[in-house]
Amino acid sequence: MSNLWDLSQIQPRTDLVVAGDTISAMFWNAVEQRGPNVWMRQKELGIWRSWTWQQTAEAVREIAGGLMSLGFKPQETASILSNTVIEWVLADLAVLSCGGVSNGIYPTDAASQVHYLCEDSRTTVLFVEDDEQLDKALEVREQLPMLRKIVVFDMEGLHKLDDPGVLSLAKLRELGREFNALHADALMQRVKACKPEDLAILVYTSGTTGKPKGAMHTHGGLVYTVRGYNTLIARTEADECMCFL
């Protein structure tokens, strides 16, 4: 009897699935294939701003370069404490492209929860959305010996901040540009070195019956899910998806 959930032999109904056996490889192959096409939109001050695949790739390349300049190594964990914003996606893709593990943290979590999730995931770099989330990170930073840097997306109200352990996303991208100028092939070497069996993301449970547990998802598992979804649900290049969590 065939396995009901074995989708490996089914061919996709659409051409949306690009080549690649890791999420990072699929992303960079999609950039090459769809460069000038619009990929994401975000409303800023009431106006929708569009991001093409090429623009996304440029930002991801710079953030990834910045991470590598800070000594971020393959299979290290970077956590993201933020609402759903473009920067969340950029940071996530940069971490994965570096061969790292991405861990999302709810922006509604208290400082104590942020501490637990960062400690349990062995987070070395923490991305935070703004001053509100930064306050939580700073409150527990001394209890996180593995945490090396905190990166802030939105620096509004923080421009006078002078803390060697905290930098803006803009500064991280600047470091990335400098790093990439000296090590042009470093990022793609990381992407090519990533394997399907490598850990890609951690998704923590709600912790209703105890402490939250980090579900471990590999690149291979995520790619299999993407291909299965695109096999069973017909989509076109004109379709759009909304992120609301």
Model-predicted regions and their roles:
Residues 8, 26-51, 157-158:
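AMP-dependent adenylate-forming
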Residues 109-142, 225-242:
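Conserved ATP-dependent adenylate/AMP-binding module captured primarily in the ANL superfamily
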Residues 99:
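Structured binding elements
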Residues 50-54, 192, 200-224:
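Conserved AMP-binding A3 loop
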Residues 57-62, 215-236:
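Conserved structural elements of the adenylate-forming
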Residues 39-93, 110-115, 168-174, 219:
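Conserved AMP-binding/adenylate-forming core of the ANL superfamily
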Residues 132-196:
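ANL superfamily adenylate-forming
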Residues 35-38, 171-204, 211, 234-240:
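Conserved pre-ATP/AMP-binding loop-to-beta segment of ANL
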